[in-house]
Regions:
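N-terminal membrane-anchoring alpha-helices
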Residues: 1-41
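Beta-strand-turn-beta hairpins that frame and shape the catalytic cleft
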Residues: 35-48, 139-156, 252-258, 284, ...
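Membrane-embedded segments
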Residues: 41, 45-140
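Short, flexible loop segments at the rims of nucleotide/cofactor-binding pockets, characterized by
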Residues: 53-57, 83-87, 173-176, 195-196, ...
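Catalytic metal-binding/acid-base residues of hydrolase active sites
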Residues: 54, 84, 113-114, 139-140, ...
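Short, Asp-centered acidic motifs that coordinate Mg2+ and/or phosphate
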Residues: 75-76, 107, 132-133, 149, ...
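Binuclear metal-dependent hydrolase catalytic cores centered on His/Asp/Glu-rich metal-binding motifs
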Residues: 129-131, 144-196, 206, 272
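Conserved beta-sheet core of the metallophosphoesterase superfamily
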Residues: 197, 202-280
Length: 290
């Protein structure tokens, strides 16, 4: 074989090896959230966000993933949907969530994959049995030394697809309408004085979230845009299509913030490129009077 042929084979092998390695190389991304609505008692509190596991495994029994979370020692763990993968067995995700719930308060919202899974009710029942707070268009007070912040969560619109089918609306229209109903329920009579975190799987509705008394939104779903290239938000994301806007990182508007997790697992045959699986840690900072 000519040298050129060997070179091509070597490049393909190296690319394939990198693509596989990058799907298993867990990274931790840190964000600091500063607000004058964060009580002094919550200054320095940390939370971990995990999203889009899709029943993936990172080492034996997911111990490498769990070890990282344990080392971060957060005040709570937020799961922002697609922990299970469609109609695949939920047992990998169940095992991860059970172990997390032994160590930390865990809050969960569903994603579109739970919305189409025949196993979701079993998964939900198992989470609740292990004291996970499943948020379905509702909110929860988190208290520390008598001071409270709010965690709200909405069920993914995929759960109500059949309710909207007869109206024959475009997918993006009925999904936004369904999500608006969920947000209305989750934030009904919510005082804007509370620092409020919203768990909602879908980042493409960031403009909608801004209309509510919410300070920080945590989402996933976009898988980091699948292929991450410089100066882009990736090449493709579900719900956003080609050249999406919100696939990773922190986005700010009107005094509010959206954090989008790149997620953990993968649901396509295409590899994640320059897009390592991500664990997010956020630290709250109380902004005192000047």
């Amino acid at each position: 074989m000519k040298k050129t042929g060997w070179g091509i084979l070597g490049a393909v092998a190296a690319f394939t090896g990198y693509a596989y390695w990058s799907t298993k190389h867990l990274t931790v991304t840190d964000y600091e959230i500063v607000s004058d609505k964060i009580p002094a008692e919550w200054d320095g509190a940390t939370f971990v966000q995990l999203s889009d596991l899709h029943s993936a495994s990172f080492g034996l029994y997911n111990n490498p993933l769990l070890s990282i979370v344990n080392e971060l020692a957060p005040d709570a763990v937020f799961l922002t949907g697609d922990m299970i993968d469609g109609d695949e067995s939920p047992y990998v995700a169940m095992a991860v969530v059970r172990k997390l719930a032994k160590e930390f308060p865990v809050f969960y919202v569903s994603g579109n994959h739970e919305g189409r899974s025949a196993f979701y009710e079993d998964f939900k029942a198992d989470m609740e049995k292990h004291h996970v707070t499943v948020l379905e268009n509702e909110r929860y007070f988190l208290k520390k030394d008598g001071a409270a912040i709010m965690v709200a969560g909405v069920r993914d619109p995929r759960f109500v697809r059949d309710d909207w089918a007869e109206k024959e609306l475009p997918k993006e229209v009925w999904e936004e309408a369904a999500l608006k109903e969920a947000l209305d329920d989750a934030t009904a009579n919510l005082s804007p004085d509370y620092f409020t975190i919203l768990l909602s799987h879908r980042p493409e509705f960031w403009p909608l979230y801004q209309a509510y008394p919410i300070d920080l939104v945590l989402s996933g779903h976009a898988h980091g845009g699948q292929f991450r290239l410089p100066l882009t938000e990736g090449l493709f994301a579900p719900g956003q299509g080609l050249m999406p806007k919100w696939t990773a990182g922190i986005h700010r508007a009107g005094g509010k913030a959206l954090i989008v997790s790149r997620g953990l697992g993968n649901v396509t045959k295409l590899p994640r490129l320059f897009n390592d699986p991500e664990i997010i840690r956020m630290t709250l900072r109380a902004k005192g009077d000047a």
